[in-house]
Structures are given as C-alpha cells and as structure tokens.
A protein has these predicted regions:
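Dinucleotide-binding Rossmann-like beta1-alpha1 core, especially the glycine-rich loop
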Residues: 67-119
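Residues forming the flavin
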Residues: 2-86, 124-241
Length: 241
C-alpha cells in the first residue's frame, strides 16, 4: 500500500498535536496524516494505573509514554508562563515572540477546557527566599504557573482530539520503521505493516520514547546531530508549617 499526503507527522504528542491543529487552521483542507505507535486518547491504559499489576511489566508499547497526548498526557499538567526554563526557543526567536506563543497555546488550552486560574511566585515571600538563596549562590527562578490537573489535562487532550479527528487522517498503534528521502524532494515513511506514506513535508516529533530511533534515522539520512543539554530537577518536600 502506498498513499500520498501533503504532510506526514510522526508522533502525536504535544508537538505533533499542535502542528496538526495549526496546519488545519492556517491551511484548511490540507491532506495530513499523523502516525503514533500508541493508541488514541480513549484507549490509553497503563496496567499499573488500572490496578492489574503492582509494578511495571515493560509492555511492548508503553501507554504512559505513547499514544495521543504523548508522555505528558497523564501528568498533572503544569503550564509555565516563562522563558527562564523549559526550553531554548529564545536562541531562535525574540523572547517577546516566545511569550506571545506561550500565551497563544494557553488560549487554545482554555478554549478546550483549561482553567483560567494562575499561580505566581512573584510574592514578597518568594522574593525573600530568592534573596536568601543568592547568599548561597543558588538562583531561584520565578514564574507564573497554571495547574491543569491530571483529569482536566486528559479532558483537554480529548477535546482537542475530537476537534481535529475528522479533519486529518490518524494511524494509531502503528510503528514507523524507516524515513526515506525521495529523489523528487519528497519524503516517505515505511510502517511495520509494510505501508508506505509519502509527503511533501515531514514533521518528526517522536518524543522521548522515540528519541533513540529518530537519532538512528537522522544518521541514515546524513543529518548532523547535536547533544542537547539536560535539565535535572530536584524535588524537595518539607513539612507543613
């Protein structure tokens, strides 16, 4: 089987979802295919969460990591309004533009069910703590934050999926084995089932679970790879005062 599309997106995490959302908005009627090795939003179920097992049994396809919504689908949904941490987009565009995009994404989340309530660490108490931290050469980063909550996070993703599901073609539970550059400048992807999909544009957003696979694909395509810096977070819990 061989089928042609305008755009093929690999991965239905946040990057893939919003790419599909924006393409439909900016180019209505675009012929778009989104592929993910996990299930749709309705059928993601971890056996630990459902109470079937007590510890990870290493499912061939992890429903916590894969499927519509990506690895963040079952998170508590914290949305940070800052460029101080969480990425390096300011290396490629002005900070003002990045903040406008952050606000825009938030508006889409609100449109699909997110709360409008935000929390801020720009408080006298936080400023005092920041001053104390500096005395020990520790730099406390402040930001406005929105807490979506796990259940609301899933509902937002479900609403977004239902908004775009009938506008694009989705292939869930489908693993891509190879990305190929065609002589005419187009791209083709080959699935585990032997299906071939070609496209004028390819957006690869395989997420954390597909990072190693994608790195190998890039090497096969002759693309240069750069090491990304890693943020290490430490969670410190203190007794309530």
């Amino acid at each position: 089987m061989r089928e042609s599309f305008d755009v093929v997106i690999l991965g239905c995490g946040e990057a893939g979802i919003f790419a599909a959302y924006e393409l439909e908005k900016l180019k209505p009627g675009v012929k778009l295919l989104a592929i993910d090795q996990g299930p749709d939003i309705y059928h993601r179920s971890c056996p630990i969460v459902s109470g079937k097992v007590r510890e990870c049994i290493h499912c061939p396809i992890c429903h916590t990591m894969c499927g519509f919504g990506g690895a963040g689908a079952f998170s508590d949904g914290k949305f940070n309004f800052t460029t101080a941490f969480g990425g390096w987009l300011t290396d490629f565009m002005p900070e003002k533009e990045v903040m406008e995009l952050i606000d825009y994404v938030d508006s889409l989340n609100v449109k699909h069910g997110a709360t409008t309530e935000t929390f801020s660490t720009f408080t006298p108490e936080a400023l005092a703590l920041k001053k104390r931290a500096l005395e020990h050469d520790l730099h406390l980063l402040s930001a406005k934050v929105k807490h979506l909550g796990t259940e609301k996070n899933l509902q937002i993703l479900t609403n977004i999926y239902e908004h775009i599901a009938d506008k694009h073609t989705f292939r869930f539970n489908t693993a891509v084995t190879a990305i190929q550059a065609e002589p005419d400048g187009r791209y083709s992807v080959v699935t585990e089932q032997g299906e071939v999909y070609t496209a004028d544009y390819l957006i690869a957003a395989p997420g954390r679970s597909g990072a190693e696979w994608f790195a190998n694909q890039c090497k096969d395509l002759g693309l240069e790879l750069l090491n990304n810096q890693v943020d290490i977070g430490v969670r410190v819990e203190l007794p309530a005062l």
